[in-house]
Swiss-Prot record:
It catalyses: 7-aminomethyl-7-carbaguanine + 2 NADP(+) = 7-cyano-7-deazaguanine + 2 NADPH + 3 H(+). Its main location: cytoplasm. This is NADPH-dependent 7-cyano-7-deazaguanine reductase. The lineage of its organism: Bacteria, Pseudomonadati, Pseudomonadota, Gammaproteobacteria, Pasteurellales. GO terms for molecular function: preQ1 synthase activity. It is found in: Cytoplasm. One of its GO terms (cellular component) is cytoplasm. Keywords: Cytoplasm, NADP, Oxidoreductase, Queuosine biosynthesis. The gene is queF. Pathway: tRNA modification; tRNA-queuosine biosynthesis.
Amino acid sequence: MNYNNECLSMLKLGKKTEYKSTYDPSLLQAVPRYLNRESLGIVKQQPFTVGADIWTLYELSWLNQNGVPQVAIADVIIDSSSSNIIESKSFKLYLNSFNQMRFPSREDVQRRIQSDLSKCAQGDVTVQIYKLSDFAMRSISEFNGECIDNQNICINRYDFTRESLQGIANGEIVEERLVSHLLKSNCLITSQPDWGSIQICYVGKQLDREKLLRYLVSFREHNEFHEQCVERIFCDLMEFAQPQKLTVYARYTRRGGLDINPFRSNFEGIPENLRMVRQ
């Protein structure tokens, strides 16, 4: 990936910014998906047929027609076939610009956000805004599957490497869901840590748990956006394990009132936006 790309140098990430309290859709900034997909060789055709970046917006507020502040939580689903990623700091600044803006209804806010995000992403976006009382009905969930974290192994490499993926898949064909809560990468621009849990669902030759964990831990000093990390993991597993079916789904902890949860699959539909214990 060309980290010196002009569009990346223009991002507000890592720079002092002014917070606006009047609605301004121009605050949204896009990162072209092709920048990372070029390095993976998947610009023209992606190995996943279904994908979405699932966001939860915890800090959403506006004024009603009488000037009374309203607060809500929203789900946003951005199709992975869209041209662009939404840069998270710009998303936060954009949402803050609603704070002193009057809207007739929650539905009007929802339509406005959906329209603005669709234009920025250049693709399909859905937005659902919830009252706090409705969102409170959601219970804390966890990924289904076997957790691979409690292995009695020594690890001393934390820079990204694909070495451990050599010979990762052997034996009979199985259908499994594997989970790790040890995913940690760093922001592409600021190097701030991004913490997440990951679920890998597949049909294929059985994956070696130790090799898989070593590979995931190697992201610990790796600098990429959430969405890019998940696509890299998907592509690497397809290359080295060659499963018949594969899903990679990561849920990251929130920052700035937003959490980002990329989902990529070649056989499953987009899941409901759950909430995990660290979210």
